[in-house]
Amino acid sequence: MGPWRCLLLLPLLAAAPRAQQQQFMEYVERRLALLEERIAQWHDQSSRYSTELRDFKNQVLGMLETAEKEREALRAEAEGAAARVDRLEREVDYLETQNPAPPCVEVDEVLMEKQAATAKQRKNEKYTKLTDCSDTIASVRAMKILKRFGSSAGLWTKDAAGSSEKIYVFDGTANDTVYIFPRMREFTLFSATRRAARIKLPYPWVGTGHLVYGGYLYYIRQQGPFQVIKFDLANKTVVDSSVFPAEEQIPVFGLSPFTYIELAADEEGLWAIYATKENEKNICLAKLDPDSLDIEQMWDTPCPRENAEGAFVVCGALHVAYNTRLPSRSRVQCVFDVSGTLPPEEASLVYFPKRYGSHSSMKYSPRERQVYAWDDGYQIIYRMEMKKKLEV
């Protein structure tokens, strides 16, 4: 190759790298342009998503404000309805007071004549050991719900004849254990059972008719015939027992079929409320000697078992509380006074405030003039307004 040909090839060889460099720059520019386009799209999408999120947030806030207003409106309506219901209950109470229902006593003129004739011949059977207590219940002054503890049925009470502040609890309708709380405060605590002493009785108890009286626990045991067990709470021993002298016993309350004997205490002493097949429609009453457990006297009362849920004795007068199969307002609708001072048809009709269900036990405290009740697992105190029997 001649020299002149080499000189011609030199410009061509120098132009080749410049062409490749130009192509590379164009490629880079295209890639950068594509990247910028995608970044612009991302910015557009991000802006759109931010706008949609802001709109959604505003929409949710608006819905929450509307829901809050509706909730306030519903609460106001509920409060108004509750106020109307309370006013209606007060009006019903007033109407019931003005137009009381007839006592829950069957009236049979022939039977009344026979009873009157028999009463003239048997005046010596009128109970004459009563004290000068002449009070009866006028109304329920106040109700206090303590807490919810244990089973739907049970019993709680204080010592009816002592000054002790201890609380005694029978949980359920059949067991062998009694809970003892030192004071009301310990019982009302959330973890109440941790503060309670437990006594395991030598014989299991049945029903909710038991009683603490003068430092002794009187409870019902069923082993063939029913027995009344007298248990010393101080030394934890059985000091006496007695077979209850009634044949073919049946549940004493129609709405509380688990209780066959209801032990009660009042200003006069110890009582037993029961029922038998011989007089299966009505409730019977007996006066007990708390020392020997002997029966001092027995009565066939005019108070029906049907729809009865509980009973207690005040100043020698049996007060029976009635309800319905579908729990409603309990009421003392039959009163039987063993002294004859207060005829059943002249007793006040006493209504209890509406609660949760029905009473499984009602224990009257003569010292405090109040009733300790167990209502569907809730422990309730009813404070009673009293008046003289002659004022009824």
Curated annotation (Swiss-Prot):
Domain of life: Eukaryota
One Pfam family it belongs to: OLF
Any coiled-coil regions, as ranges: 25-99
Glycosylation sites: 175, 235
Main location: secreted
Keyword flag Transferase: no
Alphabetized SMART domains for the sequence: OLF (SM00284)
Signal peptide positions on this chain: 1-21
Gene Ontology cellular-component annotations: extracellular space
GO terms of biological process kind: signal transduction
Every Olfactomedin-like domain range: 132-388
Key words of the record: Coiled coil, Developmental protein, Disulfide bond, Glycoprotein, Secreted, Signal
Subcellular location: Secreted
Annotated S-S bridges: 133-315
Function: Secreted scaffold protein that plays an essential role in dorsoventral patterning during early development. Stabilizes axial formation by restricting chordin (CHRD) activity on the dorsal side. Acts by facilitating the association between the tolloid proteases and their substrate chordin (CHRD), leading to enhance chordin (CHRD) degradation.
Family of this protein: Belongs to the OLFML3 family.
Name recorded for this polypeptide: Olfactomedin-like protein 3
Record gene name: OLFML3
